[in-house]
């Protein structure tokens, strides 16, 4: 197949990805879009357009990272137009399809890339979820693009430039969802080991390029938060999220239901003295409230180490299980399982193919993502939407497995 024909096919696949996502969203209608959404993101976007401000209220000035609200503001201009969001996020989903192609092509070959792109274009969870009013679709694209750039560093003609691009894209992903933070040190280790044949000076250039670009992208937001809330931090949400995942009520609703319902149950179980402490923390400001929740979570972990360890396993199981978390209706579950289960099984075949060829670098890169996500999930919690960005790498591996099966036939 010629390169030109391959690009035409890839363009068709990306167009199908865009059309499938947009069509699915329009079919469900505007009412469903606003009802099944995280409305605070759009509130932030409107505030950004109207006031050039990311403070939703006095206690949420650094609670959410800025990239997705900024994306919504750019897409809608602050107008309550769900079609504009649907179009913009369908384009994001098409971009993820192109990244899946790039990864599978690098790890296997161009045929595997086209298969991975087609699978991503029609992957049921992505088709249904990429246009939801939440950051998942944008985060999936940002991480996939960063991973593709990172994977290119060892073979790039100018690895330092490729590392700069990878670091910058990783920073953008963290400004979309800060839970990617544990991946950064793993990526640095991968870069060092992935260029073992290169001179030490070249390896240090790649590492410094990645880390430097990451810091440059993150620093404006960090400095803004230092000025606004008095702390150099990506988010003041860590404490509450840690507490939601580490208290006696964590599994009162989660994972069958939303972690928000478990957090509500935990809040209702607070003693009057604890409620008074929360009031005092609120009076001191956003970071003090974050610190209070963080301290309560660590106190629970210290008092119940065995229970915490068992809970970590349960959280990981819920995140990677074939059932949606939180649970949905039977039809939604069947549609989700029809994509996720085959992708996971075929990914094992793709990983085996790489291992037989001693291509350890892609496996290590995928493993770094899984480990980083696993650490965050074990310490905090995760719904299916938080894990779904990993499915791009499982699908890329699945593309390699499917092309291998075809060759055997």
Each language-model region and where it sits:
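Specific aromatic-rich, kink-prone transmembrane helix
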Residues: 99-102, 119, 138-155, 162-166, ...
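Membrane-proximal stem/loop segments at transmembrane-domain junctions that anchor or position
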Residues: 233-314
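Loop-to-helix entry region of an early transmembrane alpha helix in multi-pass inner-membrane enzymes
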Residues: 11, 62, 66-70, 78-98, ...
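Short helix- or helix-capping micro-motifs
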Residues: 14-20, 113-124, 128, 140, ...
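Transmembrane-helix motifs of polytopic, lipid-linked glycan transferases
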Residues: 84-108, 145, 345-349
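Membrane-interface anchor segments at the N-terminal boundary of transmembrane helices
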Residues: 80, 84, 282, 289-293, ...
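Membrane-interface transmembrane helices that cradle and orient dolichyl/undecaprenyl
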Residues: 1, 110, 146-165, 191-198, ...
